[in-house]
Design a protein with these regions (language model features):
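Conserved small-residue-rich beta-alpha loop and adjacent elements
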Residues: 104-145
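N-terminal Rossmann-like NAD(P)+-binding subdomain of aldehyde/semialdehyde dehydrogenases
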Residues: 1-113
């Protein structure tokens, strides 16, 4: 394991982070409802990134951890992340499907119908620990996409 390092942070880092968050929130609001097909495409592109760059990801992890075996990196970070992405892709349409609920009085008598429509909450920040850096980002990202 490497020794801790002090990292200098410029004074305007918080301002830059706030600006980035505001830009992401504005983009989310502008995009509106995202279809299952769009979300599946995003998951597929994330899987593609992991597959295409698996060796580079493993090399970077190896540099950080000073000798973690290549196969372990591929299994714990890359393959585990791809598995989570595939699981979400497989179940996404079912998870997004609206659910019927009984309408309360008097709406039920008047022909009213009640449904729950699942929607994304907005911009999500994922904070990951250092020990499995790729898996701890991409696994929750699968659900966020």
């Amino acid at each position: 394991m490497n020794a801790p390092q002090q990292v200098a942070v410029s004074p305007d880092t918080e301002i830059k982070m706030q600006d980035a968050l505001k830009a992401q929130q504005a983009s989310y609001l502008q995009e509106g409802y995202v279809s299952a097909e769009t979300r599946i495409d995003r998951i597929n592109r994330a899987i593609d990134v992991l597959v295409r760059h698996a060796d580079r990801i493993s090399d970077a992890i190896d540099q950080d951890f000073a000798g973690r075996p290549h196969q372990i990196n591929l299994m714990t970070d890359v393959a585990a992340s791809i598995g989570s992405m595939k699981h979400c892709r497989k179940h996404l349409k079912k998870w997004m499907k609206a659910e019927k609920r009984p309408s309360t009085f008097p709406l039920g008598l008047l022909g009213g119908r009640s449904r729950i429509h699942y929607q994304p909450k907005g911009v999500v920040g994922i904070v990951a620990p250092w020990n499995f850096p790729v898996a701890m980002i991409f696994q929750p990202l699968a659900g966020a996409l």
